[in-house]
From Swiss-Prot:
It catalyses: shikimate + NADP(+) = 3-dehydroshikimate + NADPH + H(+). InterPro entries: Aminoacid_DH-like_N_sf, NAD(P)-bd_dom_sf, SDH_C, Shikimate_DH, Shikimate_DH-bd_N, Shikimate_DH_fam, Shikm_DH/Glu-tRNA_Rdtase. This is Shikimate dehydrogenase (NADP(+)). Its EC number is 1.1.1.25. Shikimate binds at residues 14-16, 61, 86, 102, 215. The gene is aroE. NADP(+) binds at residues 126-130, 149-154, 213, 238.
Length: 268
């Protein structure tokens, strides 16, 4: 049976095995998908051994996306620009192909929410790895992006890298332009420690819809809770993005595009 896995550290919390099994059942694909704990010191050796033993592909989650990218032989454009991958596929010639389906997963989920139209103004909070993975698909969807981060130099470097692909402006967190934002996306990891991005609530009040790339089972993420406390109710966490990026990885491996909304509805 074709073997796939998700690699991360920690990994016990991962929903990927559950999601991928649902996608396989829906599309009548016979495959095994397991969670693998990556060793922080010897991840590269583990991953290469996994493929040498016959595995067909895998997902990569924190903290290994950049390290896995370095092991690949060929890359999609979106993985190359992000310098990180969340998906690897073993090609027929034995080479490893890296892709990054995070951004197309986000775009697909924004479409599900009916929050994506051309020429919108999108504010992204945070300029870390999560942001790098989503910028190209958002720009390809003709979104005008304001990218805000506490460290301006990091934001500026990222904006310059993606400028050839669309309209993107770098600002520091305390100099975000006062204008209406069709979608505000939280791409910071502050929620993992119970905090929120250091953004002025007056800026948030200018938003029309709010998306947190994090998700929390059975409760609101800190960012969603903050939005609701301000009376901003057009909100979504990132669980739909998680299912959608999984569906795009599945499509790369199996050549079949699942109905991600049906699986999202089953699992949410």
């Amino acid at each position: 049976m074709d073997l796939y896995a998700v690699w991360g550290n920690p990994i016990t919390q991962s929903k990927s095995p559950l999601i991928q099994r649902q996608l396989a059942a829906q599309t009548h694909q016979t495959m095994e998908y397991i969670a693998k704990l990556g060793n922080l010191d010897s991840f590269e050796q583990q991953l290469l051994a996994f493929f040498e033993e016959g595995a067909k592909g895998c997902n990569i989650t924190s903290p290994f996306k950049e390290r896995a990218y370095q092991l690949a032989d060929e890359y999609s454009q979106r993985a190359k620009l992000a310098e990180a991958c969340n998906t690897l596929k073993k090609l027929d010639d034995g080479k490893l192909y890296a892709d990054n389906t995070d951004g197309i997963g986000l775009v697909t989920d924004l479409e599900r929410l009916n929050w994506l139209r051309p020429n919108q103004h999108v504010l992204i909070l945070g300029a870390g790895g999560a942001t790098k993975g989503v910028l190209l698909p958002l720009l390809q969807a003709q979104q005008n992006i304001v990218l805000a981060n506490r460290t301006f130099s990091k934001t500026k470097e990222l904006a310059e890298r993606f400028q050839p692909y669309g309209n993107i402006q770098a600002v520091s967190m305390d100099s975000i332009p006062l204008q209406t934002y069709d979608v505000v996306i939280n791409a910071t990891s502050a929620g993992l420690s119970g905090g929120t991005a250091p953004v002025d609530v007056e800026i948030l009040k200018l938003g029309l819809a709010f998306y947190d790339m994090q998700y929390a089972k059975g409760t609101d993420t800190p960012f969603i809770a903050l939005c609701k406390s301000l009376g901003l109710t057009n909100v979504s966490d990132g669980f739909g993005m998680l299912v959608a990026q999984a569906a795009h990885s599945f499509h790369l491996w199996r050549g079949v595009m699942p109905d991600f909304v049906a699986v999202y509805e089953q699992l949410k």
